[in-house]
Amino acid sequence: MKNLTDSFVYLGHWPSAGSFGFNTDILATNPINLSVVLGVLIFFGKGVLNDLLDNRKQRILNTIRNSDELREGAIQQLENARARLRKVETEADKFRVNGYSEIEREKLNLINSTDKTLKQLENYKNETILFEQQKTINQVRERVFQQALQGAIGTLNSCLNNELHLRTINANIGMFGTMKETTD
């Protein structure tokens, strides 16, 4: 049991203040390394992330502009349909006796088809905006995850060399051996 507590005391030992040198204790250097890696990721990743978001924002704005242009075209079609409607109404006054019900049906069909077209264009615009937003969010998430993963792998590869890795394994095997002896 004494060996077990000694190993924990050894692992918790920090070098005294005022000394300078390389600290090979992996438990003491990980917070420092992680803070440096996080600082570098934030510093360099922020620009990439901002550029990615700006590009997505421009795509979404272009999509909105295109949808607005389509909407304006539909409004123009509506105005044309209304002009045709006025023309049909004047002709309806002339031919009221011969075909009033048929003209009314054509009028309603024009209004309904134009209204339906406007609704479809509005739905298309909203779906396009939602799709682009989801696509942008997913790509940003994927990019951030990849950058964090690459940073973590780089940190692990730079921190663990073969000698340090073997010493850590041997220390853990020794701890497990002493734990087994104390339990027996």
UniProtKB/Swiss-Prot annotation:
It is a single-pass membrane protein. Keywords: ATP synthesis, CF(0), Chloroplast, Hydrogen ion transport, Ion transport, Membrane, Plastid, Thylakoid, Transmembrane, Transmembrane helix, Transport. It is found in: Plastid, Chloroplast thylakoid membrane. F-type ATPases have 2 components, F(1) - the catalytic core - and F(0) - the membrane proton channel. F(1) has five subunits: alpha(3), beta(3), gamma(1), delta(1), epsilon(1). F(0) has four main subunits: a(1), b(1), b'(1) and c(10-14). The alpha and beta chains form an alternating ring which encloses part of the gamma chain. F(1) is attached to F(0) by a central stalk formed by the gamma and epsilon chains, while a peripheral stalk is formed by the delta, b and b' chains. F(1)F(0) ATP synthase produces ATP from ADP in the presence of a proton or sodium gradient. F-type ATPases consist of two structural domains, F(1) containing the extramembraneous catalytic core and F(0) containing the membrane proton channel, linked together by a central stalk and a peripheral stalk. During catalysis, ATP synthesis in the catalytic domain of F(1) is coupled via a rotary mechanism of the central stalk subunits to proton translocation. Component of the F(0) channel, it forms part of the peripheral stalk, linking F(1) to F(0). Belongs to the ATPase B chain family. This is ATP synthase subunit b, chloroplastic. The gene is atpF.
